[in-house]
Amino acid sequence: MPSGCRCLNLVCLLCILGATSQPARADDCSSHCDLAHGCCAPDGSCRCDPGWEGLHCERCVRMPGCQHGTCHQPWQCICHSGWAGKFCDKDEHICTSQSPCQNGGQCVYDGGGEYHCVCLPGFRGRGCERKAGPCEQAGFPCQNGGQCQDNQGFALNFTCRCLAGFMGAHCEVNVDDCLMRPCANGATCIDGINRFSCLCPEGFAGRFCTINLDDCASRPCQRGARCRDRVHDFDCLCPSGYGGKTCELVLPAPDPATIGTPQAPASAVVVPATGSAPHSAGAGLLRISVKEVVRRQEAGLGESSLVALVVFGSLTAALVLATVLLTLRAWRRGICPTGPCCDPAPHYAPARQDQECQVSMLPAGFPLSPDLPPEPGKTTAL
């Protein structure tokens, strides 16, 4: 029993690792535990050292992954007969027990669990599983990383499985990613491999050039003017008395004498420079004076008065023409302004009745000629 251990009813109450052994007694708890590879636990079981296992800590732990082997010391993998390899996973009789070569291939054992297959003409692969089909016969024609597929060589024809961004029978065509015109606002689309990029014009940004840059962000307007953003430009709404692109100019106050009076454009008057200045290199310069020529409105009809006159004359002419037309229409229908004989009241009778109207051009009360007596049954009206 190791020193430092206290045994009670075959239970080791305390065991210090590395303690030396003493002669065992019959009642020691070490009678059922390999004390060279472990010690007794408080529950009466053996507590094994690292690399050992078992009920009595009598068995070493093999290397992880060891399949057909054993060990004499921890972490070993000693292969059983017929097996080889680091993990004892190679069958030394694989050529006879498993026949790994297909399609008539011959298996050759290389030792250490390794083998190779001698394939018949037209087949290839580690196990001669692949036939020299259309892909191999065509020299693997798929381009741009495309994968040639022919069902392990047993298909009649090959097909190319293209990577993203390519198309065609041999994956030889680069798909135009700019075909759908993804770039906005007149941007230039640059095609890539399964991607595109937009070259934005000035004033725009973003992947698709859809973001209008704020030209007012730098606050270019002065005098407290309000800035209005445009496409790659801006406008300043200047307060009264200021002008210019950024309201940097102070406008002169208007002359009260010229307010409301149409003015002609200002004219530049060139006046030769005069004075007693000594002659120098700049003596030949001209003095330019800008004077504003104001022309007052001459007497006569203005534009608005002329328009009103034309409209009034047109309405008057239309009214006169309508009166003449109505008068002519009434005259053609035989309507007399005076006299009942020209417009008799409607009379309904079972028989026909003729009536003749005689109009005299003589003054009222003038007797008719005796030679023209009225006809019987006729009515004479003066």
From Swiss-Prot:
Keyword tRNA processing: no
Disulfide bridge positions per record: C29-C40, C33-C46, C48-C57, C66-C71, C79-C88, C95-C107, C101-C117, C119-C128, C135-C148, C142-C160, C162-C171, C178-C189, C183-C198, C200-C209, C216-C227, C221-C236, C238-C247
GO CC field: membrane
GO MF annotation terms: calcium ion binding; identical protein binding; Notch binding
Ranges for domain EGF-like: 27-58, 62-89, 91-129, 131-172, 174-210, 212-248
GO biological process: negative regulation of Notch signaling pathway; regulation of fat cell differentiation
Residues in the Cytoplasmic compartment per record: 327-382
Location in the cell: Membrane
Alphabetically ordered keywords of this record: Calcium, Disulfide bond, EGF-like domain, Glycoprotein, Membrane, Repeat, Signal, Transmembrane, Transmembrane helix
Alphabetized PANTHER family for the sequence: CRUMBS FAMILY MEMBER, DELTA-LIKE PROTEIN
The protein, known as: Protein delta homolog 2
Protein's organism: Rattus norvegicus
Gene expressing this chain: Dlk2
